């Protein structure tokens, strides 16, 4: 086994199996990870461990049937969620780590954030501090299929559309994947799929790895000159190769990580007519999003590329019409009120939700520095003495979080 050096850039491939599919309300059952070097060579033994659910939670039987991990098994072989989170935190916080999985941006990373939030670890720093970052092999596969599909066998689902299920891809490409929905097996399979892309399309792999961080993505965005870019996302659907050409038009006034763009594959005339009035109704805003307004979160590792990646030989396959796209851009430029109204509409659109359940409120703001000091005290306190801690928190979420933290992890104390 190669001795891992913290200064060496590396990948940490990881996966959860869970007792349900809701990333905030459902609980983890198993965590597994394998560390590789930058060339995807395994440099450490796999790590895996289990977490038993707290007494206030009922697992989803359907998930148990899929994973074959029962609550009884985790009770016997696992730990409470606090100790489970501590182990994961220590692994993820090793410097120069690119944390990567298969659909991790939408699922596994959200599980990580929520278990850290519930157990008084910072929910975010693991993905950026000490040179760390994150990436998603599923999104890389979507980009490969849309932009450079040669060399990989692409399976079809029952509807005749390309399937991006990990088990389908491994089967079609003769990759060993013995036990799907076992976290260790899924991690090995993800590494092999990543190796396949790197081998068959090395330039694509290296390009998207290089621009995975938002500071690199910013360089692709040119609002002043109305430069369109390619955006790869499941949002557009497999029938459209999970791809569109978008025109960035503005930054969200309330969140600098959100880019407002227009989907140029949509009917732009209709969208412009919709925005002749300013309306803040939630149904109207949903209609705008359905009609071509795109809110793109640069801190969620979106797959973006310059329009030049589309070669002429790709036009027919992708139903890509550059002349039509240019006409739509000119139409937007002639209707500058449209951009201003879009900015106003979304500047007033406050998406902060009041769930009245602290487990769902991770995104209702950051904790201030005083609360962070109190959080550190809680985490460093022996469970026996937690009942003696009386914190006057600034953030109203923390009182309920602290109560649940004690009840779920240290009930006997």
From Swiss-Prot:
It is an enzyme of class 3 (hydrolase). It comes from the Bacteria. Mg(2+) 2 binds at residues 17, 186. Keywords: DNA damage, DNA repair, DNA-binding, Exonuclease, Hydrolase, Magnesium, Metal-binding, Nuclease. It catalyses: Exonucleolytic cleavage in the 3'- to 5'-direction to yield nucleoside 5'-phosphates. Residues 202-349 form the ExoI SH3-like domain. The N-terminal exonuclease domain and the exonuclease C-terminal domain form a central positively charged groove which binds the DNA. Monomer. Interacts with ssb (via C-terminus); this interaction stimulates the exonuclease activity by recruiting the enzyme to its substrate. PANTHER family: EXODEOXYRIBONUCLEASE I (PTHR11046:SF11), OLIGORIBONUCLEASE, MITOCHONDRIAL (PTHR11046). This is Exodeoxyribonuclease I. The gene is sbcB.
């Amino acid at each position: 086994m190669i001795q891992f050096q913290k200064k060496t850039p590396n990948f940490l491939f990881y996966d959860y199996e869970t007792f349900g599919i809701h990333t905030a309300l459902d609980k983890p059952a198993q965590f597994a990870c394998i560390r590789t070097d930058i060339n995807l060579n395994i440099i450490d033994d796999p790590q895996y461990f289990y977490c038993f659910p707290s007494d206030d939670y009922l697992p989803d039987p359907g998930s148990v049937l899929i994973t074959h991990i029962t609550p009884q098994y985790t009770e016997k072989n696992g730990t409470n969620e606090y100790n489970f989170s501590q182990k994961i935190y220590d692994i993820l916080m090793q410097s120069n780590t690119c944390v990567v999985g298969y659909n991790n941006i939408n699922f596994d990373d959200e599980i990580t954030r929520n278990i850290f939030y519930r157990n008084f670890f910072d929910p975010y720093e693991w993905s950026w501090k000490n040179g760390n970052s994150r990436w998603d092999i599923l999104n890389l596969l979507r980009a490969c299929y849309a932009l450079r599909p040669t060399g990989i066998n692409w399976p079809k689902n029952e509807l005749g559309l390309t399937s991006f299920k990990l088990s389908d891809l491994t089967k079609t490409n003769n990759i060993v994947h013995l036990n799907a929905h076992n976290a260790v097996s899924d991690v090995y399979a993800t590494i092999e799929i990543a190796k396949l892309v790197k081998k068959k399309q090395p330039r694509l792999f290296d390009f998207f790895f290089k621009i995975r961080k938002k500071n690199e993505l910013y360089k692709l965005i040119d609002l002043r000159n109305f430069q369109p870019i390619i955006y790869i996302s499941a949002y557009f659907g497999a029938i459209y190769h999970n791809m569109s050409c978008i025109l960035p038009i503005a930054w969200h006034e309330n969140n600098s990580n959100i880019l407002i763009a227009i989907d140029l594959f949509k009917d732009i005339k209709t969208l412009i007519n919709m925005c002749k009035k300013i309306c803040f109704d939630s149904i109207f805003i949903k209609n705008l999003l359905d009609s071509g307004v795109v809110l793109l979160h640069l801190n969620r590792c979106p797959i973006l590329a310059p329009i030049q990646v589309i070669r002429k030989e790709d036009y027919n396959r992708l139903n890509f019409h550059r002349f039509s796209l240019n006409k739509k851009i000119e139409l937007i430029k002639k209707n500058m009120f449209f951009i201003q109204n879009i900015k106003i509409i979304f500047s007033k659109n406050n998406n902060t939700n009041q769930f009245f359940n602290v487990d769902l409120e991770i995104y209702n703001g950051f904790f201030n520095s005083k609360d962070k000091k109190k959080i550190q005290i809680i985490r460093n306190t022996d469970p026996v003495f937690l009942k003696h801690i009386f914190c006057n928190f600034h953030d109203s979420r923390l009182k309920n979080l602290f109560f649940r933290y004690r009840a779920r992890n240290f009930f006997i104390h």
